[in-house]
């Protein structure tokens, strides 16, 4: 990205779900900004290792295979990142699942409900818990931030999403978690914010965005007239972790082309 300087030089960032989509774009952008980056993946080892190599190899960027569906999984991922780079300054909790098939609440399987909450919420709790403990014990000067946490939500967390109540519930909870954590952690020098994308051109949303009937309807509902690129979500995430955002905490930043405004 033109204009990205080494604003995160000397910092270590952990990005969950970093092998594709918004996560991969964020890994690339943070590496360009000078950070050492650890990121998690669950499948597609070759893709993850290719991204690791693209962003500088194990000395600068490391891919960590990790299931994320329990608090213990979150703890394990933070521990692996700290083993790789010795510290942790930034956590971006990006991973999550969204099933493209409609699931009306009367027909939704309990297994789907519990799986979505486990991945999208339970593991985030573990990630945040372990990251905060690590940030708290790291030495810093009074002028330095102890750490930055960015959670990834969705417009569904504010507007709801028919036939995808499981997903919307988790994202609404992430919004609330952001504000609660900000109030709790700001006095300790840890800023917590959230980025809430709308429709983004990623593999997760491809079935809907590329559908010949649904795709144009999605674009028509966005004032800017198109879906976002993954890079356009990664940019605000990076911004929130830099000194330019040094007085921002507890915010849910909508990055959706104005879509919430016409909800």
Describe these PLM feature segments.
Residues 70, 194, 216-248, 257:
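C-terminal helical subdomain
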Residues 2-4, 102, 159, 237-238, ...:
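Short C-terminal tail/terminal secondary-structure segment
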Residues 128, 170, 178:
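Active-site helix of classical SDR
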Residues 12, 19-20:
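Conserved glycine-rich cofactor-binding loop
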Residues 102-105, 109-117, 218:
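Substrate-binding pocket helix/loop in short-chain dehydrogenase/reductase
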Residues 133, 183-187, 246:
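Alpha-helical segment proximal to the catalytic Tyr-Lys
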Residues 154:
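Residue(s) in the substrate-gating loop at a strand-loop-helix junction
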């Amino acid at each position: 990205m033109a204009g990205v300087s080494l604003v995160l030089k000397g910092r270590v960032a952990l990005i969950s779900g970093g092998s594709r989509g918004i996560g991969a774009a964020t890994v690339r952008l943070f590496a360009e900004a000078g950070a050492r980056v650890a990121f998690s993946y669950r499948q597609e080892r070759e893709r993850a290792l290719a991204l690791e190599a693209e962003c500088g190899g194990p000395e600068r960027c490391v891919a960590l295979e990790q299931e994320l569906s329990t608090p213990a999984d979150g703890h394990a991922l933070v521990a692996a990142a700290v083993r790789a780079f010795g510290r942790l300054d930034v956590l971006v909790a990006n991973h999550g699942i969204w099933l493209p098939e409609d699931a009306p609440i009367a027909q939704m399987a309990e297994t789907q409900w519990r799986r979505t909450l486990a991945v999208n919420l339970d593991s985030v709790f573990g990630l945040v818990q372990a990251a905060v403990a690590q940030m708290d014990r790291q030495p810093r000067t009074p002028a330095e931030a102890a750490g930055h946490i960015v959670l990834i939500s969705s417009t569904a967390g504010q507007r709801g999403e028919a036939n995808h109540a499981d997903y919307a519930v988790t994202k609404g909870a992430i919004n609330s978690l952001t504000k609660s954590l900000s109030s709790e952690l700001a006095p300790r020098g840890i800023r917590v914010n959230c980025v809430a994308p709308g429709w983004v051109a990623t593999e997760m949303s491809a079935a809907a965005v590329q559908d010949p009937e649904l795709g144009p309807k999605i674009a028509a509902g966005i004032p800017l007239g198109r879906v976002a690129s993954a890079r356009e979500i990664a940019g605000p995430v990076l911004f929130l972790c830099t000194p330019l955002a040094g007085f921002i905490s507890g915010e849910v930043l909508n990055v959706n082309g104005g879509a919430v405004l016409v909800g």
